[in-house]
Amino acid sequence: MINVAINGVGRIGKLILKLLITNNLNLKYVNELNGDIYSLLHSLEFDSIHGKWLADFEAKDNDLFINGKKIKTSFHNNIETLILKDIDILIDCTGVNKSSKVLEKYFHAGVKKVIVSAPIDETNIANIVYGVNQFVYDPSKHRIITAASCTTNCIAPIIKVLHENIGIKHGSISTIHNLTNSQTLVDIPHVNLRRGRSAINNLIPTTTGSAKAISLIYPELKGKLNGHAIRVPILNSSLTDCVFEMNSNTSVHEINNLFEKASQGSLKGILG
């Protein structure tokens, strides 16, 4: 049986934890950077977006029990202090460990594979968008993989269809993006004036790494795409708008047919 651990139980980590438990996968250990076991339990049971998780919760010492399943917990900021003996797969959802130099510390503790919930711009790390390039994964080569980013997962299937069938000359990407923990609730002094504005009262233009992440999947598009994000005061929905100039003439009919065919074929269940 494969033993799984999660480091970081924020927005993404919480949802992954729920999926692992719901699908009866062997989650052995969870580390959260903040709080304690009781605040973690409360955060899992009561979610501001998805409501109450109808599961049985119990906390004993440093052990969390969900539907009777025992999960060892800790609350550390340092990878070296984590309890990773016998862990096969570590899912890093901290949002801060985004370099191979830092992530290698997991292997020193005995972890066999690391999956990161954020994109990493390093050639030795596979940025995987399921349905688009999962075939590049080589178990003997890739010890660290990422699931890219939410925006990259949104646009990569679209780009796959257009670029592989017609060819993209260049393009622009705009994402209307949920607010995140990297922002501030109230106005504060900040070296980036936009980042210092209240997340709950403003539409905040900022950067997005999605265009760069796409070039990791399609190297020939490097420098041909640009993008920006607008952070908006919502938590659970985003929208991405793409404008492309194609390499050859096309039509609405051709484009729609390509998307329909892909949605019923290789991208079924991914492309709506």
Language-model regions, residue ranges each:
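Short glycine-aromatic motifs
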Residues: 57, 270-271
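Active-site-lining helix/loop region of Rossmann-like oxidoreductase modules
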Residues: 3, 7, 11-18, 25-26, ...
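N-terminal Rossmann-like NAD(P) cofactor-binding subdomain of oxidoreductases
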Residues: 1-185, 189-196
